[in-house]
Each structure stands twice: as structure tokens, then as C-alpha cells.
Amino acid sequence: MRVGPTGVCNQRGDSALGFNTRICRRDFLNAALLASGNTLLSSLAPSQLLGQQPSWGGYSGVGDYRGANGNTEDVMLGGHAVRDGAFRTRASTAADTGEVYDLVIVGGGISGLAAALFFKDEAKPNQTCLVLENHSIFGGEARRNEFVVDGQRLMAPQGSNWFAIPSSVEQFYERIGVNWREFKYQEWGGPPPAMPLSRSSYHHARQLPSPANFGFYFGANFGRQPGMWLIDPWNHLEHAPLSAQMRSDFARFLTEYNRAPIHKSEAELRRLDSITAEDALIEHCGVSREFIRLFVAPHEAAARGLGPDALSGAWYLRMIGRAGEIERHSFPDGNTGFPRHIVKTLIPEAIAGPHTLEAVCRNRVTFAALDRPENQVRIRLQSTAIGVEHEGEPGKSDFVRVAYTRNGKIYRLRARSVIMAGGGWITKHVVRDLPPTHRDAYDQFHYSAHLVANVALRNWRFLHKLGLSGGRWFEGFGYWTEVRTTATFGSDSKAIGPDSPTVLTLVVPLFYPGLPTAEQGSKGRRELISTSFREYERRIREQMVDMFSSSGFDPRADIAGIILNRWGHAYVNPQPGFMFGKDGKPAPGEVLRKGPFGRIAFAHTDLSGSMGHQMAIQEAQRALTQVLKLLG
């Protein structure tokens, strides 16, 4: 297994926590940087951060996604430089590539790649497309981490995690060669009885009620030292160290959560869009605000960025109570399988081997094949768009100028049309001639930060001994985790048991109930950037020791590696007014969707208020339809 430098153990208990063991680990910010604390973002310009050692991101794994864990240092600094206008006076010095494309797509996540595939399906044979992607590999948040633990290759999602059937985009799955009927999962290989495992990193955590092999952990904040695990909590709430009112709220929420009426009148939706989801939940479920902030807020923040106190009541209630009979699936690496299959469809040579689930998942990317001149669709990695602007008046222009940085140099090219498929937080800084209506719309989009920590384990006997495959907790670091069974086409072993190596994924939303929506996002980003890899590692180890040492967990022996994925703008947070507009203004998403601005269309998934891959694909199809009308 690849090992990085571990630094100096200088706190009491470091040895017991396993800091002096040989695992995958690397600190990312030095002491001088960390001294700036929460003022880091506001007090240091990107140029002051450049060159700081050791690396910002920590250990990043092996394989295609090594060096691409979350928003890396280079990507983060490049984005901040664009935001701060660092390239505005330098664009004139850009080297002209001489290239002219019919379509340039800014952003190589699922939205951008889907738009490229729709283009290839609809365009004339001589029409060309270029995708600019600022990371070292395509996929956006649908990327993976890879470990090798005791000879076994393990994969885990960096962000985007699972998909459901039926789906509004099933035809797209078929187009890219993803047959969900072929998904087979690891069978139980441990002692009887077989323990049911989730197919994703958090399905049991979000399932209401969760299965019997899921638990709640209560620690010092609940008067429990040592803490206690409550197994199968939904059926044993009377044993929870909670007040009678709180236990009643748990039971009431379980009953009412999935009874949210799907069909509401427009008048009722407009009313709900004027209040927070927290107030709407109090109306709908009759639970206390205290209960919502203890249990519902982290439950929802992991899926929607922030808790109900910051979200639109109409948008939120539209998203719950509609699960119905769905079948959940996950690639071994989360939804990383979707961008890999799209790229394999666009450029067959880009991933070695046949177009099968196993080959596309396990074979390496041929990076040299992505940007070949003979490709109708080219993908150019490590290329950050810094300026997109029409040549002349937008309504009369025939071309758009596109400037980007790559390997420290600035380049420019021309396009007959552009689709902005990156996030709205950066799009509003990249499109130079954006009109006031669109800028005002973008100002109504708010985003929150997220941390996804993948912890590779040599075994998970400590969980099985408790009768658990996963659990939730209500204090300390993170909120839940669980063992999952992975699709066999991507795993080295066809069976899983407590002796098997596995990866626990900790989804850690950064939210602060009670603060304004925008302020919560800013505060979360400050925390994400100003906390060192070593400090996050310490919190992970301490949390796991607190919860599992009584059942045999030993961080020195059991943890094989840790990778952090930091996402500064992981989720859009639809605040009250997002669905129908506010103060006489139209809904911000509709302003950007209604048609192209000149020769520029907008396709990022946050326009819908939901960061799911289905919406990414649908937004891409809409935007591509708009630009095809321009191309004729």
C-alpha cells in the first residue's frame, strides 16, 4: 500500500489513535497557514496560498483518480483567482490556438458530458465540440477514491452516490450502455445469519425506519459516558436517553414524514415557498424545532446541503414523501460509472477494453485519447475557463471568445456556441458580458460546503460484534456511516463479511441552523479550508474510538487509509422564494433556463435546485436543444 509521510506525533494519545502507523496519509497545510484560522479565505489571496507545502488535499488514493480528491488545491486557487478578477487584464495576452468549434462546453461533470453526447447524437458529422474541464479527470462530483487494502482493490464515491429505478432518464442509461438489470451485488460471506447491507453509502441511514441492523449512538451530550448504542432504534425508542417529548417527536416524524401530499395547488406551493422548510415541517408533522435541528437537519443536510431552517418549504415538501416503490443501485464507485460510460460512448478508445460494466469500471482511462484532433468531441482536462464573451453585441454575434488556463499558460479559441455546464458560483464570474437580469438571478443562488471522508478498513468485525452494519450519532464528527455491499463487476471479492476489507464513507455536511442561508455556506467553506488534514484525521479516529473501542475497534490495526474530499460548493440551497421568485422577481432558475443569452446557454444542475444526476442530464438536453437552433 502506498504510504505518505505521517508528520510528527505531538499530542497525547497520538500513538493510541494510530498516528504513528504506516497508512495512506499526508498533511496538507502548514502551521503558518493554519494560524490564520477562519479568516483564511478573506485574509489571504490565492497567490499567497500558492506554493505552500505540504499538499492541500492529503493522500488521494491510487488509480485514475489519484490527485483528484474533491476540489484540489490547484482547482480551488484557480477558481478563487477567476472570482477575484485576477485574469481580466491578462486575457489579452492569451495565446491563440487557432481553433474554432461549433460548441464549447465549460465543465466536464455529468451535465457537460451529457450535453456533449447529445451534441454528438444530433450534430452534423463535420460539426465539432470541445469540453473544458478544470480537474485532472472528468466527472465533477461523480468521481471515486481507490485504495488497495491487503491486496484487494476498493472503491468508494467522492460524492454522487446512487441512482433509482424507475428514473426519468432511463433511456439515457441505455444510450450509454448502463443496463441496471445486470447489477449483481456481493453475497453474504460472514457467519450466519446473513446481515442485510445497503447498496449505497447511506441508504440505511436515510431509510425511515432503518433496518434492525442499524443503530443510534448516544454519548456525553445525552448523559452517557461511556456512550451507548441503541440497536434497531425505531422499534426501541423507549430505551433512548431522550425526553418524553423528543421520543414522541421521533415517533410522530416517522409516521408523518412520508405522508407529505405530492399534489398541491399552485396557491399552496406559493405560500410554502414563502416560508422555510422547518416551519413547513412543524405544520405538517407537528414536531418541535428542537427535534428538527437534532435529527432532521443533519439527515437532510447530507442530501440537500443545509437543514430545513434554510430551505424553501415548497421545494422541500416537493422532494419528500414521494419515494414509492423504487429500486436503488450504485456502481462500486458511486455514480462515477455514469461519466465513465458517457466518455466511453463519446470516445471508445478513452477507456480500454469492451463497453461492459466491468471493463468501464475497472480498466484505466487512456488520457491521451481524450483530446485528439480527429475526435468529433474532444475533452481537455486541467483547463480552467477564465473568460467567455461574445464577439460584439450578443444578439448579433456569430462567435464567442473563450479563454482558459492550462499548465500556467493562458489560451484563447473561438466557438459558434457555448454551454456553461459548471456551477453557477463560478459561471457568473466567467461569462464576462452577462446581462444584469442574469447576474441578479445568479445572486439568488446559495451554496454550501461538504466533506466526504472515505476510511479504508482491514475489517469491520467491531460493527458486526454489535449486530450492526452502520449507525447514526448526534454529537462529535460526522453523522452516520455504514458498510455497503458493492456491485460485483467492480469488486475483487464476490462475497462480503465482517472479515472483509471495506470502506466506510462519512458524509459530513457543514451547516449551522439558525444562521442565514448564505452565511451558513460561507462559514462552512471557511471551516473546510482552514481545517488541516491532520485535524480531520484526528476527529475521525477519535469519533470511531469513542463509538467502537468497546467492541474491539483498534485504530492502529484496523484503519488502512483515509482520503478526504472537500467540496466548497457541493449543494445549491434553494431558499424561500427559489421556486416562484420573491419581491416581484421571477424564479432565478427560470431566468437562466428560458433561452440562450446570445450564443451562450446554461446547463448546470443547480438551476433546478437539485444536484442529482437526473437533473444534470435533463438540463444538458434542454441547453443542447437551445444551441442547436443557433447552429442550424
Place the predicted regions along the sequence by residue.
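N-terminal secretory signal peptides
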Residues: 1-27
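Glycine-rich active-site loop/strand segments that organize a redox cofactor
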Residues: 58-63, 136-168, 187, 264-265, ...
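N-terminal glycine-rich phosphate/pyrophosphate-binding loop and immediately adjacent elements
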Residues: 77, 87-259
